[in-house]
């Protein structure tokens, strides 16, 4: 059994709204990346967000998935999805 198998994934409504505006091909890739988070939230092109406790961003192509890892509750909360621009961070 995987060490990360018991993580619960929660996705904010803002993320679902953002996904509707993204082209289908990119949307499918992003959804796959989000669904893989509970398998191992620390895998992939990750960077911890400065000034934020337990907040991370994962790079998926030209998009960024922002999420918080609540280690005690074993919850991953995806709270933002943005296309990478000079104003993303």
Q: Where are the model-predicted features located?
A:
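Enriched for short, Lys/Arg-rich terminal
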Residues: 1-9, 17, 21, 28, ...
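PIN/NYN-family metal-dependent endoribonuclease catalytic core
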Residues: 12
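Short, well-structured alpha-helical segments
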Residues: 27, 31-34
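A short, surface-exposed loop/turn module that caps and links secondary-structure elements
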Residues: 34-58
């Amino acid at each position: 059994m995987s060490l990360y198998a018991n993580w619960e994934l929660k996705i904010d409504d803002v993320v679902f709204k953002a996904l509707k505006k993204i082209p289908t091909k990119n949307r499918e890739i992003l959804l796959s990346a989000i669904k893989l988070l509970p398998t191992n939230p620390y895998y992939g092109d990750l960077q911890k967000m400065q000034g934020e406790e337990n907040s991370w961003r994962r790079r998926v192509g030209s998009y960024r998935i922002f999420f918080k890892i609540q280690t005690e509750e074993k919850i991953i909360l995806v709270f933002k999805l943005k296309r990478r621009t000079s104003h993303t961070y």
